[in-house]
Amino acid sequence: GEEQKPVRKSDKAYHAAFLRRMVFGNPIVWVLSVSNFFVYIVRFSLLDWGMMLLPHTKGISVAVAGIMVAAFEFIGGNLGMVIAGWATDRLFGSRAHRTCVFCMLGTIVMTIVFWCIPDTVSPWVMAVPFMLIAFFIYGPQALLGIAMSNQATKEASATANGILGVFGYASTLISGVGLGFIADRYGWNSIYAVILVFAVLGLLTLTTIWKAAPDGYGAAKKFTAEYERNSSR
């Protein structure tokens, strides 16, 4: 028989088939994308609406609200991303999706804590759970792109992250227009309930891939072998 030739990565038919298997037909890619949608809603709800939400629900001055929103991202968020990355490598065997599950749990707990704090408490005390929300939600915000690149492999990471980005920025339909409508109709405190709903949805979505491998290179190798066998027939 003819000698089987290894598939060339520049082969257009192979690349198209690879994208179908590792990206468009890969359930993990879609779970990560939907999770990103929920994560971005939580993040932007507090980042974009914080200047309105804090004065209306906690009686905080606009000046102090500005400081808290800045600290939300630059202190809580940046610290959360670093710790989440460390935890992924050291505690979860490079399984970023598992780190994200715990981050979403933390987000839910801290959102409840912040929501329940009475407006008589000092704003500087309130700032602690508020920054901790950022600490937890910025973990997935940073890690989901890494998880996507690992699952789609370097051959398809750009396409997969493009999908992830579309879902992330589609979240503005909720965190932008949707939240404004909800605040007008049901009051500013209802925003916390909305944030909790989407945080829980993000958690539940991520738990469906808890057992997933750290990356998709094993699946990619298997696909390439199958493609070579089929091509040689």
Predicted regions and their residues:
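Juxtamembrane intracellular "pre-TM" segments in multi-pass secondary transporters
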Residues: G1-L32, A225-R233
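Extracytoplasmic gate region of multi-pass secondary transporters
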Residues: N26-V82, Q141, G145, S175-G176
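Interfacial helix-cap and linker-helix signal at transmembrane-aqueous boundaries
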Residues: L54-P55, A87-T88, F92, L179-G187
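Cytoplasmic membrane-interface "Motif A"-like loop-to-helix N-cap segments
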Residues: D89-M104
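Paired intracellular helix-loop junctions of major facilitator superfamily
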Residues: G93, M148-S157
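A membrane-interface helix-boundary motif in multi-pass transporters
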Residues: R95-R98, G180-F198
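C-terminal ends and interior cores of transmembrane alpha-helices
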Residues: L105-D119
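A late C-terminal transmembrane helix in Major Facilitator Superfamily
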Residues: K154-R185
